Amino acid sequence: GISMWMASIWGVCAGVDSAIKHSIRLTSGAAATRLRKRSLAGKITLVGSALRLPARRGCEAEFSVNRRYNSGQMQTADDDRRVAMIVHPAGKFDNAACAHQSIEAVPLSAAMGAEIRGVDISTVTDDQFQEIESALFRHKMIFFRDQEISHADQAGFSRRFGEFAEDAYTQGVAGYSDVQPVIKEADVAAKMIFGSGWHHDAPFLERPPAISMLYGVDIPPIGGDTIWANSALAYATLSPTMHQLLEPLMVHMSMRRVVATAQAVVGPGDSPLGRIAATRDVQQLPADLERKVAGTYHPLVRAHPRTGERALFCDRTYTTGIKGMTPEEATPILDFLVTHITQPAFTCRLRWAPGTLALWDNRLCIHQAFNDHDGYRRELYRTTIAG
């Protein structure tokens, strides 16, 4: 039976009353469900292991029952027992699509992501582009299916968002220096693949990319997904006290860990990390890589230049410390923040297919690729836009 389980919101759509505060406890024996709520209309029913709210404004919120929740917990006394209660700030889980005139946006998860339909990337109109850009800022990551585009098409579409960013790792394809191949061959059993580990793209640059784009050409039949986590939602759900602590901090971003790992486990022929792996002594790295290993500082909390939305800027791969703190002081803070950002409630996951084009706001989310497709070829092409 169920001993003492807690219910946590995995998705709350637009339109749920901003005054909602709740906790849910299930107990065995009488199988009682106790609810404390305010401004929550309609009945709540138990369906399998989930509690379901009636639809409001075309949306439906679902509460998943879980044994543990790693963040956002506080303790309350209830009948002489200590009960963990999850309280999500109201209105933060709002990934509902806006009304568009020339495109259709279909949300991918409660936290972020949307599929954009009704668009041919090779012939995007000005009206469509404005709505695509708006959808990107709202959903943090958007993607298009069944696109048949050339390198010229991808470069041209990317350039509409701004100037190309400096590429940290790879050389571009012939004739298109800003379109970088991201390829893993079927016969390469890599211990480390490009993009594995939670990360922002190139945060060690003085101007990290604002937007990143990937186009899938050859996709394995199994594995090879990409997952994103919403750093803005993660920041919004922290306490005001934590906000005050984090706001003045500067984080150090460096390629140091990637270089060390690549030199240890990646073969010189493995693209695009082979350029690093080919040089086994960090002192012999090319000058441009030396600069990226040295890294730079960025604010831990950054405001989006277009929307003003505040987001955490740290990751598992490139963040090496906090300015003015010892490693012993900084590491627990950074570990907590990355764990908080990457909890499943804040993520969306994309299953690639040939012809899928995905783009994301590198300032508002982090992502990682999965190394789970050995024996199959994976070919994508990346462009990045300067921040």
Q: Model segments located where?
A:
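N-terminal helix-forming leader/targeting segments
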Residues: 1-4, 29-35
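N-terminal polybasic/positive-inside topogenic patches
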Residues: 24-25, 35-37, 50, 55, ...
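Short, positively charged and aromatic/hydrophobic N-terminal segments
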Residues: 34, 43, 66-73, 81
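Non-heme Fe(II) oxygenase catalytic core, chiefly the N-lobe of the double-stranded beta-helix
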Residues: 80-357, 362-387
